């Protein structure tokens, strides 16, 4: 097993893993890269989603006559939703039970549910390592860009305690239209010829003043 930083498409493994939702959308992140590189795979994926056959916890293998081998691994129901840790665990169990029958001899995984999914490598990395480390095939796991080297080691992944309380990724906060007023103030301040540009401290002061004046910014 190798824990790597880099581009999964540079892998020499026979099978690549793609993270997907269950509604037929590959609009950003690694899924968009897979869509652009393998349009036929995407067409099949959309058809399977429309028929309700793509479900969390149940990855599936796409393989064509040219040798392309891709596991589409659902980490969330809807593309708008965060990824769920339980879907990662269930999907890894599926892989443990299925890789041999599918003829998979080498496989490269992305950091499942991290990035746009909102899950943390500190949780996902150890879970992936423990689920895959004993399988007798070549396995590469690509960590998120910027992951410290010490968190790529087997020692870290073996002994890290997964925070099972973090069952799903970070949720998107509903947009508050009062934030547009904050942005307008920031814009006007930045356009002042002799004013300092807005940084963290000035931004906090703007939010404080607007909140104190009765604007429902949602900040306390």
What residue spans do the PLM features occupy?
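Macrodomain-like recognition of ADP-ribose-binding/processing modules
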Residues: 1-181, 188-204, 208-212, 216-220
């Amino acid at each position: 097993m190798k824990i790597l930083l880099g581009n999964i498409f540079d892998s020499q493994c026979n099978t690549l893993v793609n993270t997907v939702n269950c509604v037929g959308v590959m609009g950003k992140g690694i899924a968009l890269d897979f869509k652009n590189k393998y349009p036929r795979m995407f067409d099949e994926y959309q058809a399977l989603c429309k028929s309700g056959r793509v479900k969390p916890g149940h990855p599936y293998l796409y393989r064509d006559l040219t040798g392309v081998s891709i596991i589409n691994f659902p980490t969330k129901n809807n593309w708008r939703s965060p990824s769920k840790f339980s879907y990662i665990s269930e999907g890894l169990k599926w892989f443990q039970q299925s890789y041999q029958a599918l003829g998979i001899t080498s496989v490269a995984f992305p950091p499942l549910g991290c990035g746009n999914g909102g899950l943390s490598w500190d949780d996902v990395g150890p879970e992936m390592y423990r689920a895959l480390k004993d399988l007798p095939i070549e396995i590469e796991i690509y960590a998120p860009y910027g992951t410290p080297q010490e968190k790529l080691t087997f020692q870290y992944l073996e002994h890290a305690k997964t925070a099972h309380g973090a069952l799903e990724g970070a949720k998107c906060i509903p947009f508050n239209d009062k934030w547009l007023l904050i942005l307008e103030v920031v814009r006007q301040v930045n356009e002042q010829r002799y004013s300092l540009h807005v940084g963290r401290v000035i931004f906090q002061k703007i939010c404080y003043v607007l909140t104190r004046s009765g604007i429902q910014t949602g900040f306390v």
